[in-house]
Amino acid sequence: MRRTLTQVYDAIFRPSRFVGANVNRMQGRAVQDVAAVSRLLVVFAGNLVIYAVPLTLAGFGTAPAAAAPRSLAAVSTPLGLSPTWTWDFLRRFVQNSLYITLAAALTFAAFHGSVQFTRSSTGVVPSLHTVVYSTSAYLAGVFSVVWLLSTSASIAVADALVLNAQKRFVYTIIDATGASLVLPSGRPTPVSLADATPADQAALATLAVILGYFVYSLYLGSRINHGASRLTATLTVLTVGLTPVVFVLGSIALSLGSLPIP
């Protein structure tokens, strides 16, 4: 419990200590590397459960109605749980976990690829350490706030503003490629801030602060765990920032069968 509280304190007030790793201790033989990777994956899995379970219990996530497997009743019934509820919970839990896991994987690929390309890498484990702690804390926080925006009527203006920004980002790429695609929700429309409440402003400020923490943690991870220069660390952060662009381009290519070149 004390260690958990210390990590929370470090994540807020000492991010350099939170994402920093003992590089000398991490650089060892293959067996030590495997052990370090295993520990980091356990940390990520634990944080993933802490992130996804409350969201799932709160009703986040969509899962089409489906009959629970008969074998599930043998496990859930003795625990006093309905097989149908348990099956619905498990499917929504997987969905809620999938987004942050995919984001972490893309972040790791971009982060480690960048430090490798700039020849500042001290190994895979320091990169994994950086990404595990930055995504399971800060990026998970960003996702949580976005989920909250989508379900709370009291911060509807903030939700509309975030959705509008997301659609503008996607349509900028769609228009740049000349793709003939239309999002189900249509093109972005202007959002009036006249009706924004203090709750809307607080939600947007919280989102901005957590996102800033995430970006800064990647910068610190590159500087501390890989000994990168300020310029190299900045380039690494910019590389990670390009992953949403790559994701949208990939989605366009999958939708059309190829990527149009304007």
Per-region residue spans from a language model:
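N-terminal juxtamembrane cytosolic/stromal segments of multi-pass membrane proteins
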Residues: 1-61, 65, 73-88
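Alpha-helical transmembrane segments and their helix-start/interface "positive-inside/aromatic belt" motifs
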Residues: 26-48, 125-140, 229-238
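Membrane-interface interhelical connector segments
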Residues: 65-84, 152-196
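Alpha-helical transmembrane segments with an aromatic anchor "belt"
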Residues: 82-173
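Juxtamembrane boundary at the C-terminal end of a transmembrane helix
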Residues: 246-262
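Hydrophobic alpha-helical transmembrane segments
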Residues: 87-103, 173-211
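Interfacial loop-to-transmembrane junctions
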Residues: 218-243
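Transmembrane alpha-helical segments in integral membrane proteins
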Residues: 97-117, 200-227
